């Protein structure tokens, strides 16, 4: 199952590697000729395999960058785990945004990785400071300043993409919810930001002493959230289980519609046992919408 937390868990028990291969052909606009077919092959080796780890090829050749594979096969995955988007932690809602953006925009994954790398380095420095492993004060402040410059640059770019994407996704999701609920409640989607555009650098400077005392980073795009509201109330607090499912279904169908608008082609919808988690009305809504996209 793809639900495993580690690549090695994708490999069948008793084997040393697993292979996933697909031949894809893309047409970005209905009036355009389709692209040439591409054979994409991904291999995952266990630690004791002749070649451990994950590696990929496109038409027999490795991609120039691993990030280059992102978006090569546009797909929207919907599995039971997504049903926790409403009541789950903010991390899951950020992951929902970032996974979609990695497919839609070349370079987003590289930007995100640069942010994460700088954040890890900063947290390591802050932990050592709080734990008594002291660097000279001037050296510590200089290192933090360098890392904060990188975090501000990458964080601003990430937040900008997230805001732009939600500006498209939100109205689509709200329209879906209105159709599903027959107008019983009004859904709203907001980006809960820690800073206004252009303000991350100042925020990092403002909270630097607080972060030194806490031993961890306290601000940035890794602390932001997506607010899901029903009739202006937080869905994670007040929504029933049925309403939560409607919110998630509305978001996932909006994700597919947003991808089609941005790229000019409909993504593949991958449903993993999610129909068993939906009641008859929501199941029929999903199947009807899927038929419309064929």
Map each language-model feature to its residues:
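Aromatic side chains
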Residues: 2, 78, 96, 108, ...
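Conserved protein kinase catalytic domain
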Residues: 11, 70, 97-98, 119, ...
């Amino acid at each position: 199952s793809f639900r495993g937390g580690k690549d090695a868990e994708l490999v069948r028990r008793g084997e040393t590697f697993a292979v996933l291969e697909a031949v894809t052909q893309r047409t970005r606009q209905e009036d355009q000729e389709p692209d040439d077919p591409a054979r994409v092959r991904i291999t995952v080796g266990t630690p004791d395999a002749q070649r451990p780890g994950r590696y990929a090829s496109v038409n027999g050749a490795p991609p120039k960058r691993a990030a280059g594979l992102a978006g090569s096969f546009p797909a929207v995955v919907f599995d039971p785990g997504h049903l926790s988007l409403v009541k789950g932690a903010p991390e899951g809602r950020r992951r929902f945004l970032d996974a979609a953006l990695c497919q839609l925009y070349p370079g987003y994954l590289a930007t995100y990785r640069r942010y994460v790398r700088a954040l890890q380095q900063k947290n390591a420095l802050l932990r050592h400071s709080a734990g008594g492993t002291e660097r000279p004060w001037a050296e510590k402040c200089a290192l933090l300043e360098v890392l904060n410059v990188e975090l501000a640059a990458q964080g601003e770019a990430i937040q900008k993409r997230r805001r732009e994407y939600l500006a498209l996704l939100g109205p689509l999701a709200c329209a879906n919810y209105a159709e599903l609920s027959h107008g019983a409640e009004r859904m709203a989607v907001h980006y809960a930001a820690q800073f206004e555009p252009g303000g991350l650098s100042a925020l990092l400077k403002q909270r630097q002493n607080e972060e030194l005392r806490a031993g961890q980073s306290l601000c940035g795009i890794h602390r932001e959230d997506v607010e899901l509201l029903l009739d202006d109330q937080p869905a994670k607090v007040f929504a029933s289980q049925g309403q939560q499912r409607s919110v998630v279904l509305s978001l996932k169908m909006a994700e597919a519609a947003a991808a089609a608008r941005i790229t000019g082609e409909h993504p593949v919808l991958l449903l993993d046992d999610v129909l068993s988690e939906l009641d008859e009305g929501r199941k029929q809504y999903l199947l009807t919408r899927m038929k419309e996209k064929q």
